[in-house]
């Protein structure tokens, strides 16, 4: 699918609710800090949109008011972004949304069969498995961004069909998966895969930074999305901190490949993401 046609993972209301949940305001605190009445806050949290109310609320939630309103008014989408040669994205349904998984290989590697690595599995690995066969790719590893069900659902089938090894960060606990400490670097052909801890949404979330393709590529799972980020299920503060330090500090041209929603770049998220 054309990246410009992939809808954003989160609406403005999703962003606001993630911030409210993450900050755990005591009763009445949000009203007193924002200067908004309980009635007005109730309207906002039920999806009633007024730009001036969002501008009043955003700073209290640590959100950028202009970026939040741009999201609410439909003024932000990453638009047309293409994947570089050597990476493929697969999109599969999961309940009422979709989840992405990825294959990466060295496009400059010679030989009939090239090594490849997968990142997550999605809900159905059939298309990925067919792609491996049609493109003469030999799957060596399946790297997991985190262990949530929509990202690992078809892991057993991929391992059975390809005999690949599955790996994840050492704070996750997916049965049968080898563990590594983030900071470790892997190689496939001439490509380098650097692992970075981006926990907060999951306790062992990992971002994989791939160097050696046409541009740097960060496969981030649910750490960050175009215009949003994964909810702080484990730690909201850690989500914000690790996204800033491990993803948004990367070169501006770095392609961000998320688990949901459209592709984006470090430059675009530094300009448009309301959380940062």
What are these regions (language model features)?
Residues 1-23:
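A short, Lys/Arg-rich alpha-helix, primarily the initiator
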Residues 2, 113, 203-276:
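Metallo-beta-lactamase
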Residues 26-31, 57:
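Short alpha-helical "recognition helix" segments of helix-turn-helix
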Residues 35-49:
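Recognition helix of helix-turn-helix/homeodomain-like DNA-binding domains
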Residues 52-67:
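DNA major-groove recognition helix of helix-turn-helix/homeodomain DNA-binding modules
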Residues 79-134, 208-221, 227:
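Conserved beta-strand hairpin/beta-sheet module of binuclear metal-dependent hydrolase folds
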Residues 103, 185-213, 249:
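Core dinuclear metal-dependent hydrolase active-site scaffold
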Residues 113-116, 124-192:
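Active-site HxH/HxHxD metal-binding segment of metal-dependent hydrolases
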């Amino acid at each position: 699918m054309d990246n410009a046609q992939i809808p954003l993972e989160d609406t403005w209301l999703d962003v606001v609710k993630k911030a409210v949940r993450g900050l755990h305001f005591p009763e009445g605190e949000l009203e007193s800090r924002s200067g908004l009445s309980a009635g007005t806050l109730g309207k906002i949290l039920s999806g009633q949109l007024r730009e001036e109310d969002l501008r009043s609320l955003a700073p209290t939630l640590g959100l950028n008011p202009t970026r939040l309103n741009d999201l609410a008014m439909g003024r932000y989408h990453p638009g047309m972004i293409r994947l570089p040669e050597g990476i493929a994205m697969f999109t599969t349904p999961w309940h009422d949304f979709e989840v992405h998984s990825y294959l990466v290989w060295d496009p400059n590697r010679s030989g009939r069969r090239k090594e490849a690595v997968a990142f997550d599995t999605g809900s159905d690995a059939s298309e990925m498995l067919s792609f491996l066969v049609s493109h003469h790719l030999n799957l060596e590893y399946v790297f997991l961004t985190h262990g949530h069900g929509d990202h690992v659902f078809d892991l057993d089938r991929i391992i059975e069909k390809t005999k690949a090894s599955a790996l994840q960060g050492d704070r996750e606990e997916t049965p049968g998966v080898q563990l590594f400490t983030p900071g470790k670097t892997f190689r496939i052909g001439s490509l380098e895969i650097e692992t970075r801890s981006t926990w907060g949404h999951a306790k062992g979330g990992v971002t994989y930074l791939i160097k050696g393709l046409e541009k740097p590529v960060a496969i981030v799972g649910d750490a960050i999305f175009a215009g949003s980020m994964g909810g702080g299920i484990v730690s909201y503060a850690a989500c914000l901190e690790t996204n800033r330090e491990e993803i948004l500090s990367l070169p501006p041209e770095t392609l961000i490949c998320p688990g949901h929603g459209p592709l984006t770049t470090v430059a675009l998220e530094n300009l448009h993401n309301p959380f940062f």
